[in-house]
């Protein structure tokens, strides 16, 4: 290891955005990418044409992008009010910060709260891994608690004990995903009560990356809870994963701090233009959601009928599939083999935390996924 590199990074494992495709083996001719929870649908051609015109006629490539994002922030605030059914104007541009993906916002939150030994973070695993990864890159301690293996509810007794016993440094941020990834379950009433009971000295970050699929938001809590921040993204339902646009909704004082620590010109002009076009045409982009939810139901029903598979209900655009503990195929080796068989067949899914996280794709992709899994489970090499 190079002598000028921090020693704690020697054993650090970097995040692999597409771990299923991280291979030198031949790529199947038919590849269904269901491993990163993206939308299976590209932007409509007319919106791409509009963006192409914007790039040619409006964007000056030799100029830095809009560093203040005021137009985009105002458009986001309007959408947040609309999506939460808030009749009076509650959120404005002062409540919004925009990042190069939600990852940048998470990193900015960590810098603003925990750096220099000021604090540690609490997560309930399995959950979105970037909270822990970004904290580790900054030298911030990560405290982990578990979830119920049956319904994936957070172990609140362990979480409360962690809050009380972690003193050097104390827990300053609690991260939750609503609904959670990879398990797809929303926050429970007990979890919400616990989050509301936390001291105002603790920042509660509620990641609503999959809000458009769950239609369950906690933004109305922000008026009474200045220590809460809501994260959202354009990468899922808005079909802009390639543009890397995330945003958060919070108290204006929290937003002002985030603006201090974020990088200047953090969003390219084309990303800003894409997000604005997406918001202006949200009715068109979001009309695919009912079909995604219908396809999700079909997959859950189909997998539930298989004697070796366990699949929970989902409030997101993905499902979490596990092998039943009492089946002949319940070993970790069997799961690894199943994952490899799917990859060989041209279906990329994410193997994580004792299961497979499968993004809901197009109807054709979902049929292939179902067939590939059913075929793989009857192969002799998958028997544990």
Curated annotation (Swiss-Prot):
Top-rank taxon, per record: Bacteria
Associated pathway: Amino-acid biosynthesis; L-histidine biosynthesis; L-histidine from 5-phospho-alpha-D-ribose 1-diphosphate: step 7/9
N6-(pyridoxal phosphate)lysine: residues carrying this PTM: 236
EC number: 2.6.1.9
Record-level Gene Ontology MF annotations: histidinol-phosphate transaminase activity; pyridoxal phosphate binding
Coiled coil: none
Pfam family membership, one: Aminotran_1_2
Record GO biological process: L-histidine biosynthetic process
Reactions catalysed: L-histidinol phosphate + 2-oxoglutarate = 3-(imidazol-4-yl)-2-oxopropyl phosphate + L-glutamate
Keywords: Amino-acid biosynthesis, Aminotransferase, Histidine biosynthesis, Pyridoxal phosphate, Transferase
SUPFAM superfamilies found in the cross-reference section: PLP-dependent transferases
Cofactor dependence: pyridoxal 5'-phosphate
The family this protein is said to belong to: Belongs to the class-II pyridoxal-phosphate-dependent aminotransferase family. Histidinol-phosphate aminotransferase subfamily.
Subunit structure and binding partners: Homodimer.
NCBIfam families reported for this sequence: hisC, PRK02610.1
Classification via PANTHER family: HISTIDINOL-PHOSPHATE AMINOTRANSFERASE, HISTIDINOL-PHOSPHATE AMINOTRANSFERASE-RELATED
Full protein name: Histidinol-phosphate aminotransferase 2
Organism expressing this protein natively: Nostoc sp. (strain PCC 7120 / SAG 25.82 / UTEX 2576)
């Amino acid at each position: 290891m190079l002598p000028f590199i921090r020693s704690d990074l020697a054993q650090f494992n970097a995040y692999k955005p597409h771990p299923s495709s991280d291979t030198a083996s031949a790529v199947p001719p038919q590849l269904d990418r269901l491993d990163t929870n993206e939308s299976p649908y590209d932007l409509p051609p007319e919106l791409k044409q509009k963006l192409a015109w914007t790039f040619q006629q409006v964007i000056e490539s030799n100029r830095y992008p809009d560093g203040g994002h005021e137009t985009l922030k105002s458009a986001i605030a309007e959408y947040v009010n609309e999506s939460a059914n808030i009749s009076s104007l509650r959120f404005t541009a002062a409540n919004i910060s925009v990042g190069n993906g939600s990852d940048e916002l998470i990193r900015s939150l960590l810098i603003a709260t925990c750096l220099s030994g000021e604090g540690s973070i609490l997560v309930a695993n399995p959950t979105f891994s970037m909270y822990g990864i970004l904290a580790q890159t900054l030298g911030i301690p990560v405290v982990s608690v578990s979830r119920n293996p049956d319904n994936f509810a957070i172990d609140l007794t362990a979480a409360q004990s962690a809050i009380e016993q972690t003193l050097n440094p104390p827990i300053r941020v609690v991260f939750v995903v609503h609904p959670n990834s990879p398990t797809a379950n929303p926050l429970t009433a007990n979890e919400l009560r616990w989050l509301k009971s936390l001291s105002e000295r603790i920042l509660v970050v509620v990641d609503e990356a999959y809000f458009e699929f769950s239609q369950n938001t906690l933004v109305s809590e922000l008026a009474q809870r200045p220590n809460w921040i809501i994260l959202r993204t354009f990468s899922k339902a808005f079909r802009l994963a390639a543009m890397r646009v995330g945003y958060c909704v919070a108290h204006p004082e929290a937003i002002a701090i985030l603006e201090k620590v974020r990088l200047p010109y953090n969003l390219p002009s084309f990303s800003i233009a894409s997000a604005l076009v997406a918001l202006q045409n949200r009715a068109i982009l979001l009309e695919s959601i009912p079909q995604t939810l219908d396809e999700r139901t079909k997959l859950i029903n189909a997998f539930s009928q298989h004697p070796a598979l366990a699949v929970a209900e989902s409030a997101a655009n993905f499902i979490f599939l596990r092998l039943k503990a009492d089946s002949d195929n319940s070993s970790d080796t069997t799961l690894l083999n199943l994952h490899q068989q799917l990859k060989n067949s041209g279906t990329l899914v994410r193997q994580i935390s004792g299961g497979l996280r499968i993004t809901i794709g197009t109807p054709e992709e979902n049929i292939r996924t179902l067939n590939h899994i059913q075929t793989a489970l009857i192969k002799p090499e998958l028997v544990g």
